[in-house]
Amino acid sequence: MAPTLKLQCHFILVCLLALRGESRYLELREAVDHDPFPHLAGGASPKRELEGEPLYRRALRCVDMLSLQGQFTFTADRRQLHCATFFIAEPEEFITIHYDLVSIDCLRGDILQVFDGWILKGEKFPSSQDHPLPTTERYVDFCDSGLSRRSIRSSQNVAMIFFRVHEPGNGFTITVKTEPNLFPCNIISQTPNGRFTLVMPHQHRNCSFSIIYPVAIKISDLTLGHLNGLQLKKSSAGCGGIGDFVELLGGTGLDPSKMLLLADLCYPLRGPAQMKVGCDHTVLRMVSSGKHINRVTFEYRQLEPYELENPNGNSIQEFCLSTL
């Protein structure tokens, strides 16, 4: 992977780390210090908005990442040509971005675009194979649609905006809210440890669960139509000829379609399947024909430094390969 893309993927990793624990305090403290709505500084809360509580507000940086609902304002203090904000919600949520106020000069080359998912140097999540819309329809350009599309909802728990502002003082204000997603499909995990169940009820689509960490992952339950158990098949045999299966992918980029197939599961197996993946990015992907109700339950944890320092001794092979 190119050094620039690797650096940007590491930026996402740093941002995800900053969303956890004490690191979040630093972001919120900085947000309060730069709050463009000082009269609400004392009442703004980093928690998700509750009914009757004031809307959380803060300024946006040129490059930013948010996991909070609220109202966010970007005002250019100088010419800003390469800006982006990454949004991430809980796995079971959609993200809605609403334009409250936009003051940009489209004729001069300003840009304000929403992208349904995340994209870095052409690598997308969800991939083109997994998203219900073609790539061109995943972009919503304010300069093309104006306020006729004032609210834009994502198809999964991540979204982003790109913007370019030439004139100092110009910018925009958006309100970000989340809505429940009864059957979450494509997901980026905010945390390096967790447990999740992907369910796809009679829908012909693919779902990817993304973990941007090296992890140990254990698949404890798999239901693919009439199958009740698990079998791990080496990728040379493959499950591609079967309409419903689960893949484990590893890589260093963002796009699951460009990642290495480590293993696939499509037949019964006694007991859980467990493996360690030393890649920067691990994806569990479920392919569904639409003929069945498919379900996979798994848990994952971030690998410890000592496990990565001695990969062969900890069942982690080279080139991000995994073993049982």
UniProtKB/Swiss-Prot annotation:
The keyword Oxidoreductase does not apply. Disulfide bonds join C62-C83, C106-C143, C185-C207, C239-C266, C279-C320. Its main location: secreted. GO terms for biological process: behavioral response to ethanol; cellular response to calcium ion; cellular response to cAMP; cellular response to cocaine; cellular response to estradiol stimulus; cellular response to estrogen stimulus; cellular response to gonadotropin-releasing hormone; cellular response to immobilization stress. It comes from the Eukaryota. One of its GO terms (molecular function) is peptide binding. Glycans are attached at N206. Keywords: Disulfide bond, Glycoprotein, Secreted, Signal. It is found in: Secreted. One of its GO terms (cellular component) is varicosity. InterPro entries: CRF-bd, CRF-BP_C, CRF-BP_N, Sperma_CUB_dom_sf. Residues 1-23 form the signal peptide. The keyword ATP-binding does not apply. Binds CRF and inactivates it. May prevent inappropriate pituitary-adrenal stimulation in pregnancy. PANTHER family: CORTICOTROPIN-RELEASING FACTOR-BINDING PROTEIN. Belongs to the CRF-binding protein family. This is Corticotropin-releasing factor-binding protein. It comes from Ovis aries. The gene is CRHBP.
